[in-house]
């Protein structure tokens, strides 16, 4: 059977369960689609996951990019057979207790284990690290954040990024320009952050600026409004994405929208309008999660935006290690020692407050 050549489109979709249905195969063959995000509902065990990712990658060429939210703590989609990853705040606690060097070493090991284990199962990308500062205001961020100190966040994220690279994965910093100061959860409401741009510059924006300079591959903007900068949420804002992120900060990587089905995005209109505004604001790729009906609505008469960098940016997010090589790495004593070290950092407190961030069952 000939595998069809279909350039990757700018939409990332999802699926319902452990295997692809015929309807889902047809959806994923649509030229509008370029990637797929997996959730807990798609994971039964490691062998099933490998079968699923192989099935997805066999559909078309170039292969669909497969992503997951696999940060650690409350946001680790795959559990059985994977190393339990600590909440990122654990690395911040090491920073405070044992110093920057110890914390950076730990962050590098977490990134390496996280990426290698996912790579072994055919996953290209984890949407990590969280670059939000922990101001103590935002439960949906909370211990997903490394620290409140921008320098600590940037240095720990950079160390994690180096570990991800060893495991064959790129980084995706989120949620630009910072979700940690607001109280609301943008999955459920549209939060507002009333600080000025200068206040954001001295704190929340600093990790994004540093990580951009250090090769961060992708950014995901927040569904948060910053009224003193723009009346539109950051993910729908040309000011935030084209002027501040691209021009002022100089970010040259991929911009993924956050999920366009989140409540924080719904005020922009229907799914076609949300996608249009996202693309016009500067997003390269939009996520449409947990609503296959909206993916179908979006791809009906879909016109792929003029983005000459899209193919290159998609390919840049592809895994660079490969499943077989990652599985070989996992057999080494050095890697198994890293797994034991990382598992020792995790604790039941990491998931206090629930594991369902952004998840639908």
Curated annotation (Swiss-Prot):
InterPro entries: Beta_hexosaminidase_bac, Glyco_hydro_3_AS, Glyco_hydro_3_N, Glyco_hydro_3_N_sf, Glycoside_hydrolase_SF, NagZ_Beta-hexosaminidase
MF GO annotations: beta-N-acetylglucosaminidase activity
Important for catalytic activity (site feature) positions: 185
Transmembrane segments: none
Gene Ontology cellular-component terms listed: cytosol
Swiss-Prot/TrEMBL keywords: Cell cycle, Cell division, Cell shape, Cell wall biogenesis/degradation, Cytoplasm, Glycosidase, Hydrolase, Peptidoglycan synthesis
Disulfide bonding pattern of the chain: none
Catalytic activity of the protein: Hydrolysis of terminal non-reducing N-acetyl-D-hexosamine residues in N-acetyl-beta-D-hexosaminides
Positions with a binding annotation for substrate: 69, 77, 144, 174-175
Cross-referenced SUPFAM superfamilies: (Trans)glycosidases (SSF51445)
Subcellular location: Cytoplasm
Record's keyword annotation contains Nucleus: no
Signal peptide as annotated in the record: none
Gene3D superfamilies from the UniProt entry: Glycoside hydrolase, family 3, N-terminal domain
Pathway involvement of the protein, from the record: Cell wall biogenesis; peptidoglycan recycling
EC annotation from Swiss-Prot or TrEMBL: 3.2.1.52
Active-site annotation: 187 (proton donor/acceptor), 258 (nucleophile)
GO annotation terms (biological process): carbohydrate metabolic process; cell division; cell wall organization; peptidoglycan biosynthetic process; peptidoglycan turnover; regulation of cell shape
Record function comment: Plays a role in peptidoglycan recycling by cleaving the terminal beta-1,4-linked N-acetylglucosamine (GlcNAc) from peptide-linked peptidoglycan fragments, giving rise to free GlcNAc, anhydro-N-acetylmuramic acid and anhydro-N-acetylmuramic acid-linked peptides.
Family that this chain belongs to: Belongs to the glycosyl hydrolase 3 family. NagZ subfamily.
HAMAP family: NagZ (MF_00364)
Protein name listed in UniProt: Beta-hexosaminidase
Gene: nagZ
């Amino acid at each position: 059977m000939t595998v069809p050549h279909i350039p990757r489109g700018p939409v990332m979709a999802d699926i319902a369960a452990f295997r692809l249905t015929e309807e889902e195969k047809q959806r994923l063959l649509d030229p509008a689609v370029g990637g797929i995000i997996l959730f807990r509902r798609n994971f039964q065990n490691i062998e099933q996951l490998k079968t699923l990712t192989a099935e997805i990658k066999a559909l078309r060429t170039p292969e669909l990019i497969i992503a997951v939210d696999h940060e650690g703590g409350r946001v680790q989609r795959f559990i059985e057979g994977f190393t339990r990853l600590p909440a990122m705040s654990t690395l911040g606690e090491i920073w405070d207790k044992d110093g920057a060097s110890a914390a950076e070493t730990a962050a590098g090991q977490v990134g390496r284990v996280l990426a290698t284990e996912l790579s072994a199962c055919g996953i290209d990308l984890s949407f990590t690290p969280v670059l939000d500062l922990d101001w103590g205001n935002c439960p949906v961020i909370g211990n997903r954040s490394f620290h409140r100190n921008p320098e600590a966040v940037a240095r720990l994220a950079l160390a994690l990024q180096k570990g991800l690279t060893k495991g064959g994965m790129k980084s995706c910093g989120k949620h630009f320009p910072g979700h940690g100061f607001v109280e609301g959860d943008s999955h459920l409401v549209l939060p507002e952050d009333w600080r000025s741009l200068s206040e954001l510059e001295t704190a929340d924006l600093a990790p994004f600026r540093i990580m951009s300079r250090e090769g961060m591959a992708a950014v995901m903007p927040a569904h948060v409004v910053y009224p003193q900068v723009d009346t539109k949420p950051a993910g729908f804002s040309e000011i935030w994405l084209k002027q501040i992120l691209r021009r002022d900060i100089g970010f040259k990587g991929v911009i993924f929208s956050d999920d366009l089905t989140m409540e924080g995005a719904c005020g922009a209109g229907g799914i076609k309008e949300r996608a249009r505004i996202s693309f016009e604001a500067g997003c390269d790729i939009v996520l449409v999660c947990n609503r296959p009906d909206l993916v179908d609505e979006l791809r009906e008469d879909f016109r792929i935006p003029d983005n000459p960098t899209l193919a290159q940016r998609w390919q840049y997010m592809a895994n660079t290690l490969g499943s077989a090589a990652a599985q070989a790495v996992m057999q080494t004593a050095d890697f198994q020692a890293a797994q034991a070290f990382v598992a020792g950092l995790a604790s039941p407190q990491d998931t206090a407050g629930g594991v369902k961030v952004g998840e639908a069952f």
